[in-house]
From Swiss-Prot:
One Pfam family from the record: FBD
Domain called FBD: residue spans: 349-401
Superkingdom of the source species: Eukaryota
InterPro entries (alphabetical): F-box-like_dom_sf, F-box_AtFBL13-like, F-box_dom, FBD, FBL13/AtMIF1-like, LRR_dom_sf, LRR_FXL15/At3g58940/PEG3-like
Protein name, UniProt field: Putative FBD-associated F-box protein At5g56690
Domain F-box intervals: 1-47
């Protein structure tokens, strides 16, 4: 003990940073030297699931834990809190608890704040000081309520915003919050039912990465996206009713990851500039693929389709025809998990007459990978036959059999 206590305080603080916050605080009883060291930790994490070791489900244990945070968090002395994470699973906070802890973090120029409320959504981010925090760079909320005050707000440094299972005070809360973030670069929204939103408006000129996940039960109103600087777009949409995406021009978009059950092709008009496209959609259709003729993906280099049904090759073959510079094609076959959906394979023209070969087969396709190949499926065999017969530039091939 004497040897480690002889180390400089700065080094001891770095050592304490490797410990859970509650354990680091407990070292304050070791000696006078250790009494205040934990107060200079740059990162703090309070999580009742990890920290409550006795009587996890008891009201008294959670009350003791609340008191522990209320006592120790205000004692923190570092001028900047690099990150503060608050996670609650087994008890109910009072509104003033979370509000006071957030205000302490803001007063210490917090840079990253995470609030995770498992199983409950009665914790409101209503502290007015939070919405004017100049130091905040990252804000993450899970299962909380966003209550934006009517006063003038600004988050001038916020670059990352993650909102999962969040409930909003009203229809304007999210729009107002986004309008306070002039330099926001990454936005992730995961929607579930009862979030008090109908449509969704994302109007953030500075945004570079956008991730939208919508589950069954969410409203089916339109999504409006105005993000001219966007580089990456993810849309996972499992809503039961048909909805549309209205997207302003995104000329800098380079990568898209799409999993939409209905009309995913409607988005293709926005993807003319992308280099990487991942598609997890229902390919099964006896009709012609539904995106507009004349759309060409001149910059697309990597294509990853996830296959659920028969007749997947119809849309894929058209995408290949419209992607003259494609270098990497990786097919992930998950049909075995969707046997109830699989329809009858209807051979398309290329399986009968291979005279029309995609340009990328002749000039650019270098890598071809298949995960879970079904040798008993005629459609799979037809497509592989086409690839190996005409893809002249292949350098790498990988096929995993189911």
């Amino acid at each position: 003990m004497a040897e480690i206590s002889g180390l400089p305080d700065d080094l001891l603080v770095k050592i304490l940073a490797f410990l859970p916050t509650k354990v680091a605080i407990s070292t304050s009883v070791l000696s006078k030297q250790w009494r205040f060291l934990w107060m200079w930790l740059p990162k703090l994490k309070y999580d009742d699931y990890d920290d409550i070791t006795d009587g996890f489900n008891s009201v008294s244990a959670f009350q003791t834990y609340r008191d522990f945070i209320a006592k120790n968090l205000p004692l923190h002395r570092a001028p900047i809190i690099e990150s503060l994470s608050l996670g609650f699973r087994c008890g109910t906070l009072q509104p003033e608890d979370l509000k006071s802890w957030v205000e302490v973090a803001v007063s210490r120029s917090v840079r990253e704040l995470s609030i995770l409320a498992y199983y409950r959504n009665n914790y409101a981010l209503s502290s007015s000081s939070l919405y004017t925090c100049k130091s905040l760079v990252t804000l993450k909320g899970f299962n909380i309520r966003v209550d934006v005050p009517p006063t003038v707000c600004l988050l001038p440094s916020l670059r990352t915003l993650e909102l999962k299972r969040v409930r909003y005070l009203n229809e304007d809360s999210l729009r107002m919050l986004l309008s306070f973030c002039p330099v926001l670069e990454y936005l992730s929204i995961e929607r579930h039912d009862n979030d008090n939103l109908r449509g969704l408006v994302v109007d953030v000129p500075s945004l570079r990465r956008l991730s939208l996940t919508s589950y069954t039960g969410c409203s089916s109103d339109d999504y409006v996206i105005v993000t001219p600087s966007l580089k990456y777009f993810k849309a996972f949409d499992y809503r039961s009713e048909i909805s549309s995406y209205k997207i302003e021009k995104i000329p800098e978009l380079e990568e898209a990851d799409i999993s939409i059950e209905r009309n995913p092709e409607k988005l293709f008009v926005y993807f003319k500039s992308i280099k990487c496209l991942s598609l997890q959609v229902d390919f099964n259709s006896k009709e012609e693929p539904g995106y507009d003729s004349g759309i060409v993906f001149n910059h697309l280099e990597e294509l990853t389709p996830y296959i659920n049904d028969a007749n997947w090759s119809k849309l894929l073959f058209r995408l290949l025809n419209d992607s003259p510079k494609l270098r990497v094609l990786e097919i992930s076959n998950s049909k075995s998990f969707y046997k109830e959906k699989i329809g009858e394979y209807l051979p398309v023209s290329w399986s009968k007459n291979q005279g029309s070969v995609p340009k990328c087969f002749l000039n650019s396709l270098e890598t071809f990978r298949v995960k879970w190949y079904y040798s008993e499926e005629q459609e799979d065999r037809d497509f592989l036959s086409l690839i190996f017969k005409h893809a002249r530039c292949l350098k790498s091939t990988s096929i995993l059999h189911r």
